[in-house]
Amino acid sequence: MNRLKLLVKAPAKINLSLDVLGKRQDGYHEVKMIMTTIDLADRLELMELAEDRIEILSHNRYVPDDQRNLAYQAAKLLKEKFNVKKGVSITIEKTIPVAAGLAGGSSDAAATLRGLNKLWNLGLTIDQLAELGAEIGSDVSFCVYGGTAIATGRGEQIEHIKTPPSCWVILAKPHIGVSTADVYGNLKLNRVTHPNVDKMVDVINAGDYKGICDTVGNVLEDVTFAMHPEVARIKAQMKRFGADAVLMSGSGPTVFGLVHHDSRMHRIYNGLKGFCEQVYAVRLLGERETLE
């Protein structure tokens, strides 16, 4: 029997600006941030199973194969909401580092929602998929859409803006994991530097690359740097090597640099390879997903 298969890409995201406005009554934090997709992606193969079960496969030992996996949760949500009696095997080929502040797990969940919508002929719109994504995790709605957007609420309210000018994004991740809950737990909003998110929207919409580089900011940086000084050292090293702008993504520990010129990108990339285990040079993507 030929089983239906589908391949789906799950691109990573970076935060060009991330601010936390306060704690909500539901326990989440109110955020205002700008996210954009980059050309670093996991690849998922979705294969229909005759048996009514969800199977997660991956060669990466850090990828859970049970309900802790957000792709599993996405498949389970669709099965329960729409009474799907088929099963699915989800093979995740990881390229995005795990627990890195790049929304790898959220993007896998979003890719699963988009892919199963097609595989199971559910006929949902991308807005409906994004709404379902919000039930799984705060970044999943954005990852369903991709592109470049302002995210508010707990991160699930999405407003699209223009794509920033094309450039290189150099990523460096130290060999540590950072607990997002711990970072938010240690955040003191009156003791941190708040970025100007509105100004970032203006310079992105104006296509002002220098303005973007001058305006990047992440309110969580100081907290993560205090907990993990090696993250601050990577940022300092990337600045020293000459990146146009350097920032930690999400709650860390990945640090990214924006670089316009190819020759400088190669120099920074090679310099960081001797300093940090996981280094990537990719393009800023910023393209929105479509449902084929």
Curated annotation (Swiss-Prot):
It comes from the Bacteria. The active site is at K13, D139. It catalyses: 4-CDP-2-C-methyl-D-erythritol + ATP = 4-CDP-2-C-methyl-D-erythritol 2-phosphate + ADP + H(+). Its EC number is 2.7.1.148. One of its GO terms (biological process) is isopentenyl diphosphate biosynthetic process, methylerythritol 4-phosphate pathway. InterPro entries: GHMP_kinase_C_dom, GHMP_kinase_C_sf, GHMP_kinase_N_dom, IspE, Ribosomal_Su5_D2-typ_SF, Ribsml_uS5_D2-typ_fold_subgr. Pathway: Isoprenoid biosynthesis; isopentenyl diphosphate biosynthesis via DXP pathway; isopentenyl diphosphate from 1-deoxy-D-xylulose 5-phosphate: step 3/6. Belongs to the GHMP kinase family. IspE subfamily. Catalyzes the phosphorylation of the position 2 hydroxy group of 4-diphosphocytidyl-2C-methyl-D-erythritol. This is 4-diphosphocytidyl-2-C-methyl-D-erythritol kinase. The gene is ispE.
